A protein has these predicted regions:
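Short glycine/threonine-rich loop-to-helix capping motif typified by GTGT followed
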Residues: 266-277, 303-320, 339-346
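Conserved small-residue
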Residues: 9, 27, 81, 102, ...
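ACP-dependent fatty acid/polyketide chain-elongation machinery
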Residues: 1-66, 88, 244-256, 349-363, ...
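Feature captures the FAD/FMN-dependent oxidoreductase FAD-binding
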Residues: 74-96, 101-106
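Conserved catalytic cysteine-centered active-site region
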Residues: 1-2, 36-79, 85, 109-172, ...
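Phosphate/pyrophosphate-binding loops at sites that engage ATP/ADP/AMP, CoA/4′-phosphopantetheine
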Residues: 84-96, 246-250, 281-297, 319-323
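Condensing-enzyme catalytic core mediating Claisen C-C bond formation in acyl metabolism
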Residues: 4-8, 35, 213-288, 297
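Glycine-/small-residue-rich "gating" segment that lines the acyl/pantetheine channel
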Residues: 123-130, 171, 175, 179, ...
């Protein structure tokens, strides 16, 4: 028999804020975190905008010496993980250490550090390569550092599945608890690819918005004039806990992780296919023993791409049938941009807060809704509403899909 899993801690680093209170306030009030890129000169690239993390100081979490040994994506993951752990109010002890684990992943990992090290190598030779280059770039090192920092001796690894990474990490962590391999898991995703290669690579694919003159309206899911996604960065991390374990210690419970579904399109490396996401959604509902009518809110993948937004709309209609018209569907990417491997992490945070606070954040920048995208997208204003169960979707290159459900407790 599966054990129940609840969410007892949340942490976030994002373009809309580097703590839970700030980020949620900005999301609910429809404030965009997208602006012109400041980290490097993007003028040679067609896209000049991104959702950068601002005013972030890693030295408030770890020493400057430690920080220099890590790429920025690890900084973000550590910070969000430490926030979530503090939020849950649990201490690691000799008695419980082996029952607490970490699964925090990244879609791409240490790209800026790889770029910088390549420049050093070409200009000054191999002797200038830092001995921390490899461990500072590895994707599983967020989990490793969190495990070491707190003495967590349970399962520790990372999932890598492009833009579904964060959700897959959370779903896998929940299953470890459900089937008895752990009692508590720290899980989510982190990413930092606002760099020449990161922006340049996606621009070469013509995947990014080029609305450079108006950054805050560039990410516009389901709008008729959407022209691509906006790259974002940051991290979102949850603490998942076995229900009786959390209840016994009097923990605050944000919601119950109640369903997890996965699927593959088996179609194309980048082009979407509506049947794959449909099956992922249906699998999540089946896993949670949920009926279609149990779901009121969907935090959609909603990237603001011409093909992707219509495809997700079609998948939702296929999965939910007539009930799709009753769903409130929201894309927080309209404010944060697309955080790639961290997207499922921060969107799990936002989905959990939507259920906990009984409010759907808005999808901003819907000026002219695409007639082919004909669901209720909570356009431009947040909405107080009853949410018994919220669903979050993530889809990634290679046709990998994930959906998770959070129930009000």
């Amino acid at each position: 028999m599966k054990r129940r899993v609840v969410i007892t801690g949340l942490g976030i680093v994002s373009p809309v804020g580097n703590d839970l209170t700030t980020a949620w306030d900005n999301i609910v009030n429809g404030r965009s975190g997208i602006s012109r890129i400041t980290r490097f000169d993007p003028s040679a690239i067609t896209t000049h905008i991104a959702g950068e993390v601002k005013d972030f100081d890693i030295s408030t979490y770890i020493s400057s010496k430690e920080a220099r040994q890590m790429d920025t994506f690890i900084h973000y993951g550590l910070a969000a993980g430490m926030q979530a752990w503090r939020d849950c109010g649990l201490e690691v002890t000799e008695a419980n250490a082996e029952r607490i684990g970490v699964i925090v992943g990244s879609g791409i990992g240490g790209l800026p550090r790889i770029e910088e090290t390549q420049v050093e190598y070409l200009s000054k030779g191999p002797r200038r390569i830092s001995p921390f280059f490899v461990p500072g770039s590895l994707i599983n090192l967020i989990s490793g550092h969190l495990s070491i920092a707190y003495g967590m001796k349970g399962p520790s690894y990372a999932v890598v599945s492009a833009c579904t990474t964060g959700l897959h990490c959370i779903g896998d962590a929940a299953r470890l608890i459900e089937y008895g391999d752990a009692d508590v898991m720290v899980a989510g995703g982190a990413e930092s690819t606002v760099s020449p290669l990161g922006i340049g690579g996606f621009a070469a694919m013509r995947a990014l918005s080029t609305r450079n003159d108006d950054p805050q309206t560039a990410s516009r899911p389901w709008d008729r004039d959407r022209d691509g996604f906006v790259l974002g960065e940051g991290a979102g991390v949850l603490v998942l806990e076995e229900y009786e374990h959390a209840k016994k210690r009097g923990a605050r419970i944000y919601g119950e992780f109640v369903g997890y579904g996965m699927s593959s399109d088996a179609h194309h490396i980048t082009a979407p296919d509506k049947d794959g996401p449909r099956r992922g959604i249906v699998n999540a509902l089946r896993n949670g023993g949920l009926n279609l009518e149990d779901i009121q809110y969907v935090n959609a993948h909603g990237t603001s791409t011409p093909l992707g937004d219509k495809n997700e709309t079609d998948a939702l209609k296929l999965a939910f049938g007539d009930h799709a018209k009753k769903l409130v569907v929201n894309s927080t990417k309209s404010m944060t941009g697309h955080l790639l491997g961290a997207a499922g992490g921060i969107e799990a945070v936002f989905t959990t807060l939507a259920v906990y606070n009984q409010v759907s954040p808005p999808t901003i920048n819907i000026f002219n809704q695409d007639p082919e995208c004909d669901l209720d997208y909570c356009a431009n204003e947040a909405r107080q509403m009853k949410i018994d169960v919220g669903l979050s979707n993530s889809f990634g290159f290679g046709g990998t899909n994930g959906s998770m459900a959070v129930r009000r407790v």
